[in-house]
Regions:
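Terminal accessory carbohydrate-recognition/targeting modules of carbohydrate-active enzymes
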Residues: 68-71, 77, 149-155, 166-167, ...
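Short, hydrophobic/aromatic beta-strand segments
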Residues: 12-14, 127-135, 172-174
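A short beta-strand micro-motif common to beta-rich folds, especially ectodomain repeats
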Residues: 1-7, 119, 159-165, 169-183
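Beta-sheet-dominated interaction scaffolds and their linkers
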Residues: 17-18, 23-124, 166, 199-202
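Extended low-complexity, intrinsically disordered segments associated with secretion/export
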Residues: 7, 103-105, 138, 144
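Edge beta-strands of extracellular beta-sandwich domains
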Residues: 10-18, 185-193
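Internal, hydrophobic cores of structured domains that mediate oligomerization or house catalytic pockets
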Residues: 161, 188-201
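Surface-exposed binding patches on compact interaction domains or structured appendages
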Residues: 2, 54-60, 78, 95-98, ...
Length: 202
């Protein structure tokens, strides 16, 4: 620029260096969504705290209207882990976490005693998952109604249930255990042959 003084004009050379704003994390400095995704994989609690901070939109979304609108839509979700998971899936930084069960068809013969069994659930991929477990049959007693990523040992969770013999009628009894995430569902069909009740009064 030109500096004007009483002694005349002087051309002054200058340059600006723009320093991109970053945030310090346990993995080092982070300033893009690739860095953030890596943080989610190794320290989800730290990532959640950053995701909900004022710095997230400023540093990681950088004025991108599409990303900011997506973030705002998901921000008020009751479960912040689900919000963060869906955000990363929507921007294609990860695939949706899926799950499977060991056996969808189960048959039992019950004769005078309760029976305990379990469903082996295996998750595929990394990230957060919440599973809702439902069974309307009164003779099936479920151990859990909700399962999250924290309940798994490695990639496996064993869901226990009990068949209550006292609530069975004679002949076949049918039940469905439904395990659902927001993107996937598994249905376990159960058939129980209950003991026939013999009337000796006559």
């Amino acid at each position: 620029f030109t500096l004007v003084t009483n002694a005349g004009e002087k051309e002054v050379l200058y340059s600006f260096t723009a320093v991109k704003e970053t945030v310090d994390t346990s993995l080092g400095k982070a300033d893009n969504l690739f860095h953030f995704t890596n943080l989610v994989q190794v320290n989800k609690e730290e990532a959640v705290s950053l995701y909900r901070s004022d710095k997230f939109k400023k540093i990681f979304l950088q004025g991108d209207d599409v990303l900011n609108n997506l973030y705002d839509v998901l921000y008020d979700r009751e479960n912040v882990y689900e919000s963060m998971e869906e955000f990363l899936i929507a921007i294609k930084k990860k695939s949706a976490l899926t799950f499977s069960v060991d056996n969808n068809i189960r048959d039992y013969n019950i004769d005078g005693a309760n029976e305990k069994d379990s469903i082996i659930i295996e998750k595929n991929g990394w990230g957060y998952i919440k599973l809702d477990v439902q069974c309307e049959a009164p003779f099936i007693k479920m151990k859990r109604g909700i399962i999250t990523s924290d309940d798994f040992i490695g990639d496996v969770y064993e869901l226990d249930y009990i068949i209550d013999d006292k609530l069975l009628h004679g002949g076949n009894n049918y039940a469905y255990i439904i395990i659902s995430s927001y993107s996937h569902q598994e249905v376990i069909e159960i058939t129980i042959n209950g003991k026939e009740i013999v009337n000796d009064s006559g």
